[in-house]
Amino acid sequence: MRFVFCTATAMLVACLSNYRLPGVVAADQAEKSAAGQVAQPAGAVTIENETVRIVLGEDGRCKSLLEKATGRQWLRPSPGHFFYLKKQGKLFAGTKLASDGDKLVVHFADSGLGAVYRLTVRPRYFIVGLEQIDGDGAGEVEEIGLGRLEPAIDENIGWWLSVRWNEQFACCALGLSDRVNTSNVGAIVYRQFGMTGQQAAFVAVPTKDLLDVIEQIQRECNLPSPRIGGQWAKRCEDVRRGYLFVDMTEQNVDEAIRYAKLGHFGYIMTYDGTWASSLGSYPINLKNFPRGEESLKATIDKCHAAGLKVGMHMLTSFVGKNDPLVRPKPDPRLLKDAEAVLAADIDAQVQEIPSATPLDQFPLSPAFYGDERQGLDILIDDEIIHYRQIDHQGRKFLRCVRGFAGTTAAPHKAGAKIHHLVERYGCYLVDLRTSLKDELAELIAGVFNRCGFDMIYFDGGECNAANGPYWYWVSQQQMAIYNRIRRDILVQGSGGTPWTWHIFARGACDDFAAVAVKQYLDYHKIADSWMHYTRSFMPAELGWWGFFDDQPNHPATTPDEVEYYAIRMIALDTPVSLETTMAALKRHGRTDELLELLGRYERLRLSGEVPPEVRKRLRQGEWHLVDGPRREFRPVRYDTHRLTQPGALTVGNSSARQPLRFRLQAVPGLAQPGDGANIVLLRADSPLELPPPQPNSPMPGAMAASVDLTQLAGGTGGTGGAVGAGAGVQKAASGKPVSLVKHRGLAVRLRVEQPLPAAGPCAVLNVQLEASNKTYRDHYIDLDFTGEKVVILPEPTTERMLPEFRPAHANYAFKAAMYSNFHYQNISALNFRWMRTTQPLPRCTILSVEALAESDSRLENPTITCGNQKLLIPATLNTGDIADCSQPRMIKLFDRNWNLQKTVTAEPADGAPQLAPGDNQLHLEWTGRGAARLTIITLGDDALPIDGAN
């Protein structure tokens, strides 16, 4: 290694001519590299090691970033300054740089400030440490940079690890303590966390070597570096195995082990609410583990004996409202984020609480999805009070619930402090500046160590940003727990920081979706989460993926959804974790079969038999693994149609002639618009003309209008009056949500005026149901017509959202429109949103909206006609029942949860209908009433053989 420098002044040259360090030479004495002599400006400082030569100019800008092995120049054109600082909100670049032995002396523009950095060069990285800041106002410096590399690399930019890389080269910045923030290959320190003495390591190496160098830095600089079985956690075999995330207890552990074995999972992780009875104190849940820790340890021991490891799920720093830290007396170390002063004495019954100070910092919304300031709970002395409103003057809490969350209502004196309790996802948080952080860490680590857990999932970690800057505070509780664990540990969680990158073994690709699961996997889990992780050199797994039984807000998991995940698992050579409940696994009739399918794919992935070129093809489209003498993947397509009688559809077959394969399900029939059993959400005498989005409105998803459904008559529907006529959102003042459990389909009568666009896609309107917990279901209408029309929306069309018009987060979180906690029995609003606009935008008026009454369907002897061939199913399908024909003429009949009822042979017996190449006209008819969902399954000819197959 070498640190090559050239002094900035003749005086420094004279001084340094008599001060030589091993491996340090003057710039004019530098040897030629493989690329030849580097032209260096006068006064340059050169940093050189085995992999890279970096030249910093006297003006503080980087002049060269040369890869020595190839002679390639990686520096971005017109780079900025290597150092900077911020004082009183103003940025000052490091515009003058000189070297003094192993120190760099930097002056910052006209700030009157300078800094001294110590430079340490290692064979494959170098370290920059801040030694001092000098000059008038040095104590007013808010932040200062430790350096920034600016490679001309844009292919991959890490968000968690501060790295830029492509297939050839990588540049990375690593803080050497949790008080150093890194981003975009730069490092920053801040006054509030301490600046002098902090260090950052910079790496510029061939990409294939980056992880080796980072592991070396962890070892040489005493950074966290967890190991599993003697291997670095990020590269250990356990990281390649998935896990079953389920409510495992001492009573059901044998069944949980059986399920995990079927899916070939390496771990079972149990929910926080399963092993503990509340968040915060985390008392062992004696219902599930009757002997406390003894039961929990026995359960884990049984998993270990079966060859499985066990993960602990927790919500990082969350404190449940049912926890001893809250009731009967709240712990003073709960996090608070707003303060007011009680204006007058109050007794224990009063429901209006006056404040002597403004309440503009107190939220107006409950704690639902997201990380914004929210929650309606305040603390006065030892009483928690829940408020529902704040008066228009912003000086009084209204409609208060006294003695909330198990506390005791009590009188309070004027002048008492009113604190807002920070709330996320219905829980309070620990104030991480207090001793409660370490108490919680001791508690969790103690259970982990004593009971023999192998993995921890720090869920909800991102919410700790409520304490302060995300990059620092999100790591604090996680690290406090990690540092106390005395076992090999696989760490995952949500909320990553530069410091926790070191302890995390991999990342999970976000929560599961209950609807549009295939699109959610491709357009979010893979395109967003998996790419974000891998761009930061973090291994990833495709969980969490939900496994469902049938519910009003989502169907039961289907075989093609399982295979879709399994295919992507092989394509990306990435494991998957399955989140579900034991109850859902038991209710679903094909659980064993589908877990075995997943396990078969997992074994194939782990075997490494699928060649890279095949895996690359499997990243797109749907595929089916065909076992037999020749194992191969074949393209598969699922075309789904909702039909009433007479039901006709056209099915395309782009492949050779093949047997008709299908899935037929009886679905609820829907009443006609105007039927007295419907629930009127917007009456015809209250039309809504939808205004266009404002020019600066985020798109897609800009709100055009909203109808408050809690103000329907009695909140029960019927012919209730319309509200919300005109533009804008109207908030509820009273009333109850509407139940649409038996009215899930919508009929929208609307009028579209003005010319349609001459070319290109049409405008798209979202008729959105909003539940009282701020979750949604989207229904899209293409405005590709003019005049008046009734559009029937039998079910949500969420599968279009991510491929076509992902909503701007400022409008609504797309995940809130896909999660399973949407409840049709608690619908509070009907929203109209613009998902796509055109020029000119058609004039659109909503004339009425009805929620259509559902009725039971009965499909007797359903018959499918294809050309001149017929297939009759000799059975009756009631609502939810499924007829599955994956093999010619063999029909398996299931209930809505895929429990097998019986197997029948389709008629006639002389052969099954065939799909000819090209378009095929199909007709579906039956005796009885109702509607059907018909899915036609076609296999393609473009097979992908697996090398090594017999």
Where are these regions (language model features)?
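Autoprocessing Asn-cyclization modules and mimics
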Residues: T316, G320-R402, G406-A409, G669-A671
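Carbohydrate-binding surfaces of carbohydrate-active enzymes
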Residues: L296-G320, L334-E339, R568, L572-D675
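Carbohydrate-recognition beta-sandwich/jelly-roll modules
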Residues: I47-I268, D272, P290, A298, ...
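Extracellular beta-strand ligand-recognition surfaces/modules
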Residues: I144-G147, L660-F662, G674-V680, H743-V748, ...
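Extracellular ligand-binding interfaces
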Residues: L681, P687-L690, Q694-G715, G721-A816, ...
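Aromatic-lined carbohydrate-binding/catalytic grooves of carbohydrate-active enzymes
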Residues: E237, G242-E339, V422-A441, A445, ...
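Intrinsically disordered, low-complexity segments enriched in serine, threonine, and glycine
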Residues: L364, R402-A405, A410, A414, ...
